[in-house]
C-alpha cells in the first residue's frame, strides 16, 4: 500500500473515536530530532507536517493534533516518551521512529497497548518476524532485505571470501544476518 494511503486509511478506521469526541485524533511523532542524527528525524517531521498542513490540519479528512517528541537516539528516553504519549496524551497512533535500536526498545510497549505504530524509517527484522503485530506497520524496508540480495549476488558471482562490516546495533546486526542467510560457502 502506498505510504500516502496508509495513514489516512488508519485514521478513517478510527472515525468512531472522532465521531464521539469531535476532537482531533492525537498522533505522537517521536523521532531523533537532536544530535548528529537529528537531521534525518527533522526531515521526517518536516515532511509529515507538510502533508498535514497541505490538508488543512487533517489526514484522510480527519482533524489531527501532532505531538512532537525527541528521543535523542536514546532507547531509555524513547521508552519514557512512549509512556507519556500513551498514558497522558492518550495517542492512538505513534509514528516517526528513525533508528532500529529505538524501535526495538519501544515496539512491544506500544503494540501491547494496542496503539498503532507506523514506522517511517526503522525496520528491524524481528518486528517483521517473531514480534510481528497487527498494530505495527513499517513503511520503509526490513533491515535484512537489502543484505539478503547482496548474499545471493555474492553466491552467484562465486565469491569465496567476503568481509562484512556493519554498525553494532540492531540495523547492522540485521544486515549481517541477512547476508549470511543467503550466502552459501
PLM features: residue spans?
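Immediate post-signal peptide segment of exported/extracytoplasmic ligand-binding proteins
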Residues: 19-29, 57-63, 155-160
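Beta-alpha junction/loop-to-helix N-cap segments that form part of ligand/metal-binding clefts
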Residues: 24, 39-44, 54, 58-129, ...
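Extracytoplasmic ligand/sensor domains, especially the bilobed periplasmic-binding protein
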Residues: 91-185
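Short, surface-exposed alpha-helical segments at coil->helix boundaries
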Residues: 38-49, 172-180
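Short beta-strand segments enriched in small/hydrophobic residues
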Residues: 24-40, 97, 161-165
Amino acid at each position: 500500500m502506498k505510504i500516502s494511503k496508509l495513514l489516512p486509511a488508519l485514521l478513517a478506521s478510527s472515525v468512531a473515536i472522532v465521531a464521539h469526541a469531535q476532537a482531533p485524533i492525537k498522533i505522537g511523532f517521536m523521532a531523533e530530532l537532536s544530535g548528529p542524527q537529528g537531521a534525518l528525524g527533522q526531515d521526517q517531521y518536516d515532511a509529515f507536517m507538510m502533508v498535514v498542513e497541505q490538508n488543512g490540519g487533517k489526514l484522510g479528512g480527519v482533524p489531527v493534533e501532532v505531538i512532537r517528541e525527541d528521543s535523542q537516539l536514546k532507547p531509555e528516553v524513547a521508552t519514557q516518551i512512549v509512556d507519556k504519549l500513551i498514558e497522558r496524551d492518550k495517542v492512538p497512533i505513534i509514528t516517526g521512529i528513525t533508528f532500529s535500536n529505538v524501535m526495538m526498545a519501544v515496539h512491544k510497549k506500544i503494540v501491547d497497548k494496542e496503539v498503532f505504530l507506523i514506522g517511517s524509517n526503522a525496520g528491524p527484522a524481528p518486528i517483521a518476524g517473531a514480534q510481528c503485530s497487527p498494530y505495527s506497520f513499517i513503511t520503509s524496508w526490513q533491515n535484512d532485505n537489502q543484505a539478503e540480495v547482496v548474499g545471493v549476488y555474492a553466491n552467484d558471482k562465486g565469491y569465496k571470501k567476503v568481509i562484512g562490516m556493519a554498525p553494532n546495533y540492531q540495523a547492522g546486526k540485521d544486515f549481517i544476518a541477512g547476508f549470511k542467510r543467503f550466502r552459501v560457502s
